[in-house]
Amino acid sequence: MEELQGYLKIDRSRERDFLYPLLFQEYIYALAHDHGLNKSILYEPMENLGYDKKYSLIIVKRLITRMYQQKHLIILTNDSNPNFFFGHNKNLDSQMISEGVAVIVELPFSLRLVSSPESKEIDKSMTTLRSIHSIFPFLEDKLLHLNHVLDILIPYPIHLELLVQTLRSWIQDAPFLHLLRFFLYKYHNWNSLITQKTKMILFFSKENQRFFLFLYNFHVYESESIFVFLRKQSYHLRSTSSRAFLDRTHFYRKIEHFLVDFRNDFHTILWLFKDPFIQYFRFQGKSILSSKGTPLLMKKWKYYLVNLWECHFYFWSQPDRIHINQLSNHFIDFLGYLSSVRPTPSAVRSQMLEKSFFIDIVIKKFDTRVPIIPLIGSLAKAKFCNFSGHPISKPAWADSSDSDIIDRFGRICRNLSHYYSGSSKKKSLYRIKYILRLSCARTLARKHKSTVRSFLKRLGSEFLEEFLMEEEQVLSFILPRISYFSKRLYKERIWYFDIIRINDLTNLS
């Protein structure tokens, strides 16, 4: 463990010791504003400050001074109007400064990445890896040769002070860390949102989005440090990275940066875990570690990771958060798909002179399916159907025009079809389409105070022509020269490289 601690400190010699003075620089807040924090406000209302939508050094100084006046914070709890604090919006105060803090705290990391000699080469390679679908061809190529997977939920710190102590290894500016600690305790519920999938949207809330995104990225960045030096023991460990996934960028670049700093004396310590076939991939708080090793080796991996996170990183990691599964009889729930490696038996007829015989062989096939039950649950939460999958009308959209209603339903249907174009079997997708189509018809019938049957009989089904467009028609537009094969292509898995975010219904499922 001492050798591991020494290794992890190798690249931490470039800390910026003086970050706190940057809080008083106006250009920091202008930078945070110009980088497009959606719906963020870097100034208080004019009636509160008396300034014409400006932020200045005086404002920032006053905000920081008020935030450190703990007595006033205590008095505030008994105030009848807790949203304002000496005539100012307390939430807006913290939001304004936290946006500046988010920009400043990223400096030690961004400067390291820019100065890295491999950064330009990595930037070029990222242009082809922006799509979420780019990970699935990689899985199809690699998982066929592996046997077991570790399904891991990344642990979270048990106390906020531990996160501050970890940040101290990168940032040694005490006043800045003190202010950062204030924000961590102000938003004390952030650590409960990291690994709970149902609350991921709350985690990336409208307020302080960049600040919390950095904390999450840094947390994952530290938890994945173990794979940096294990990469030398497992030469095939790779990471598919993309600028669209901010939480994966640091891991890829950290691997490239640490290549020259690896220490050979770890060879004798980690010999039990040397595995030439190991793959690691992650999205948000869930990661998958796959290997060709035996179940005993996977149990050693599990024991090793749990103890490493608890003893070195002080992360609370329950053993039941890591599940060992066999690829041949288990689905991997990842990025909205249920992926597995299924053995497919086949018979080969061989002819030798006058004799012929059959040879039974088993070929592994990468299988991806649509998770129908979670998707129906997501549609039920969005009020398109009940939890049994029975379509219902959407009353909230009944006030819109007919074309707007059809366009909304059609857009959702096409987006789901586009996202799940890589599914091996499309029957589940047909059921989702049926729910959306009938929900659209019920919504229109509700608007016109009619039944679905009479409404369709009176207007016909032509008004749903665009909504009912099948994927083979879409492929004929995308690939006009090979439209003859579009129907055949539709039956195959198709991965699109223009999908840069996971589907909302998929993410909520």
UniProtKB/Swiss-Prot annotation:
- Which InterPro entries does UniProt cross-reference here? Domain_X, Maturase_MatK, Maturase_MatK_N
* Any one of the GO BP annotations: RNA splicing
Q: Which UniProt keywords apply?
A: Chloroplast, mRNA processing, Plastid, RNA-binding, tRNA processing
Recorded GO molecular functions are: RNA binding
Q: Which PANTHER family match?
A: MATURASE K (PTHR34811:SF1)
Q: Which domain of life is it from?
A: Eukaryota
Official protein name in the record: Maturase K
Keyword tRNA processing among UniProt keywords:
yes
Q: One GO term of the cellular component aspect? A: chloroplast
Q: Which HAMAP family match?
A: MatK
Q: What is its main location?
A: plastid
Specify whether tRNA processing is a keyword of the entry.
yes
The entry's function note states: Usually encoded in the trnK tRNA gene intron. Probably assists in splicing its own and other chloroplast group II introns.
Q: Which Pfam families match?
A: Intron_maturas2, MatK_N
Where is the protein found, in the record's own terms?
A: Plastid, Chloroplast
Q: Which family does it belong to?
A: Belongs to the intron maturase 2 family. MatK subfamily.
